Amino acid sequence: MQSVIYSNKSQECERAIMLLLNVHEDFHEYILDEDFTDKQFHAEFGDTAEYPQISIGLKHRGGLKETLQFMKDNNMF
């Protein structure tokens, strides 16, 4: 399954990348100011969205906390 991370290169984003690597998940990282702007990020995910935002498969899962819960619920660990 392909995953996507919208990242600002913060420590939280690096944790999300390590998580996906550890569960052998293929992913693509989109980086703030290289692949998208902050305005585009908030237009897509909302004004209160924080980095990282993660999609697994074709579905947006949310931030790191929501992604961890999804992975736990789906026995991905």
What are these regions (language model features)?
Residues 56-77:
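Non-catalytic, surface beta->alpha helical segment in thiol-disulfide oxidoreductase systems
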Residues 31-48:
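Thioredoxin-like thiol-disulfide oxidoreductase module
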